[in-house]
Amino acid sequence: YKLLMEDNLLVTTFLIDKMLQWGTPNDLEIYNSWSRYFNNLTIKQERVFNPKNTTLILPMAGKGSRFEDEGYVLPKPMLDIDGKPIIIQSVDCLQKSDNNIFICLGEHIKNFGIDGTLEQTYKNCNVISLDETTEGQACTCKIGVEEGGVDLESPVLISACDNGVYYDSEKYLKLLNDENVDVIVW
């Protein structure tokens, strides 16, 4: 951004209180190292429930090739973060939802039982199996909307399977319940 400022372009920053990134093998290794150091430091916040029939759509149908290339056997969503799979840590950072739609690769379901892990952990869990990867997360989410029977007149929360967020739940619910707000991006 410094180069943009040198060109006299307007640069605005939005500060995020806390964010954890587990998207690459190096990210995961660094996080686990610091986590052990700080005695299992993970995001601890009350999971807020929004009574507006919210659906969570969570794409996790990638190959995880960066991890595979580093010798990891488990798919990225099943890798351990403080005793829980990454996918569970990621979802537990979010508001509670009435409907949870997870889009996974069929091979991860067959070989690693990712569907069982999700179904044991979350109520109203719909695991959609894909035979192959898509062109990206947006395409995967579209499949989740279509095959999951998502009510697009109710709130939909789309998140990733490999990060955690810490947010002000009161402000979030205020935005979510504001009739003038159509989309919240964070």
Where do the protein language model's features map onto the residues?
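Conserved donor-nucleotide/metal-binding helix-loop-beta segment in metal-dependent transferases, i.e.
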Residues: 166-186
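Short alpha-helical oligomerization interface
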Residues: 72-77
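The conserved acidic donor/metal-binding loop of glycosyltransferases
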Residues: 160-164
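The conserved beta1-alpha1 loop
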Residues: 61
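Conserved beta-strand scaffold positions in the cores of enzyme catalytic domains, especially
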Residues: 11-13, 19, 78, 127, ...
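Short, high-confidence coil segments that cap the C-terminus of an alpha-helix
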Residues: 9, 97-98, 153, 179-183
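Conserved N-terminal catalytic core of the sugar/cofactor nucleotidyltransferase
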Residues: 41-58, 66-68, 80, 84-158, ...
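Conserved alpha/beta core of the MobA/IspD/sugar-nucleotide pyrophosphorylase nucleotidyltransferase superfamily
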Residues: 1-56, 152
